[in-house]
Regions:
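Anaerobic metallocofactor- and corrinoid-dependent redox/one-carbon enzyme cores
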Residues: 2-176, 182, 187-464
């Protein structure tokens, strides 16, 4: 169906719904690369005007990719909760925005509507929102998950401890891991990106993390971010797997380029559930996403990068994950050119994820050839923390020596917790205090915690 909008006697045409969504998107290099972006700020404003007047029901009547061609579309439509949708079903996209921002809309109202909001509805309304709108609404969308601790409670900010090493050297990983723990990092997950996807190497890393967590009785979970098929094989061997990781995207074709489909994700989740390793809950999937992934696989179907990203959240939502995060600036300036675009994308992703009911975190990051620097990351992580972001990354010095990109450091989480009065997950916070890492006042204790002297001695004197 085509859409038109007139401004000062000039008519603007949009051939279909996905074209209208793309033209209404805030500027980003991914959409320009794909030839989908508005040709001018005037066209962008007109497209946003036209989008604001569309009924939300249009996204159910006109799927962006026909469900008979795409399993992600089928999942989104088949899992849509009509009862949850009823209170907002008469709204236009513009009225939906006003409802989200209204003081009359309670946090309970937002939570009740989650399963009635499709990813495309979330993406559409985000295109009409300023940054402060994205922050204000996301802050009210609390999403709590559990495995060995409780993540996502209001007033909490968790971190993924990311002790990557370019050769997967056990001592190098252990040093970074201990460094992170001494800064209060790791309550979301201790997660390693392996240098290779070799099952033997991944198994060795999983045993290393399991040993550290068990020896020190750390109330957290581990993950080696291997391909889901590798993790499945290792679970069959009896290797200690806490969380199952996989990168996901918003179209069937993009997921196929990752070597996955929905059935494979379901198989992996069932296998992990059968291990019964969670002490507090059974949220055990960990997904990473990022704007531009479908475009980079030539699998975007003419859909803009941000809407494709929101569709990935529809995939994630089906598997009740413990953690989901956008790796916002990782693909590079071809997709998000500069700090301004990275900041906007991070806020959009967090908003859409939280609105859809996901435990949404963010890898606040950029590549060295982007027009961005650490000050931009300071801005984004602060805005996200104000917005109630579930977790960020903890990388030694913010410089990942294996993935060769810039993220956030252990110190960054301490800064955010200090200036905004945020705390780690409650079980992990209690462990930090018990170990003498924290001083009982949500701050680092002075000196080396006596209970970790042995671990430090092992790293300096022998192989961990």
């Amino acid at each position: 169906m085509a859409y038109t909008q007139s401004l000062k006697g000039r008519s603007f045409g949009f051939k279909d719904l996905k074209t209208l969504l793309a033209r209404a998107s805030p500027r980003r290099s991914a959409d320009e690369l794909a030839g989908l972006a508005a040709a001018s700020e005037e066209e962008r404003a007109v497209a946003q005007w036209a989008l604001a007047e569309l009924p939300l029901t249009i996204f159910l009547a006109e799927p962006l990719i026909p469900p008979e061609e795409d399993e992600v579309s089928r999942l989104i439509l088949d899992s849509h909760d009509r009862t949850a949708f009823t209170p907002i079903s008469a709204f236009t996209v513009g009225e939906f925005r006003e409802w989200l921002l209204s003081d009359a809309t309670s946090d309970a109202d937002l939570a009740a509507a989650r399963q009635g909001i499709t990813p495309e509805m979330a993406a559409a309304v985000s295109k009409l929102m300023r940054n402060q709108d994205l922050i204000a609404v996301a802050r009210r969308c609390a999403v709590t998950t559990r495995f060995r601790n409780t993540i996502g409670l209001p007033g909490r900010l968790s971190t993924r401890l990311q002790p990557n090493h370019p050769t997967d050297d056990p001592r190098g990983i252990a040093v970074s891991l201990l460094d992170g723990l001494l800064y209060g990092s790791g309550d979301a997950v201790i997660g390693i990106n392996p240098a290779t996807d070799s099952p033997e190497d991944v198994e060795r890393l999983l045993h290393l993390l399991d040993e550290v967590i068990r020896r020190h009785e750390i109330p957290t979970q581990s993950c080696v971010l291997a391909h889901v098929t590798t993790t499945l094989e290792l679970m069959r061997r009896g290797v200690p797997v806490d969380l199952v990781f996989q990168s996901i995207a918003g179209t069937e074709a993009a997921n196929r380029s990752f070597g996955i489909n929905l059935a494979l994700l379901a198989e992996a989740r069932d296998a992990a559930l059968s291990l019964k390793r969670g002490a507090l809950g059974d949220n055990l999937m960990y997904f990473e996403t990022g704007q531009g992934s479908a475009l980079s696989a030539e699998a975007h179907h003419g859909i803009d990068a941000q809407t494709c990203e929101a569709r990935a959240y529809g995939v994630a939502r089906a598997f009740s994950p413990l953690l989901v995060n956008t790796v916002v600036g990782f693909i590079g300036p071809e997709y998000l050119y500069d700090g301004k675009q990275i900041i906007r994308a991070g806020l959009e992703d967090h908003f859409c994820g939280k609105l859809l009911g996901l435990p949404m975190g963010c890898d606040v990051c950029y590549t060295n050839h982007a027009e961005a620097d650490q000050n931009d990351m300071d801005n984004l992580m602060t805005l996200l923390a104000v917005a109630g972001c579930t977790y960020i990354m903890g990388v030694p010095g913010a410089d990942d020596v294996m993935l060769a990109y810039q993220s956030t450091s252990f110190h960054d989480a301490l800064y955010l917790r200090r200036v905004l009065g945020l705390r780690p997950a409650p079980e992990f916070e209690a462990w930090l205090n018990r170990m003498g890492i924290f001083d009982g006042r949500n701050a680092l204790a002075l000196g080396v915690p006596p209970r970790l002297h042995g671990a430090i001695h092992e790293l300096t004197e022998g192989t961990p």
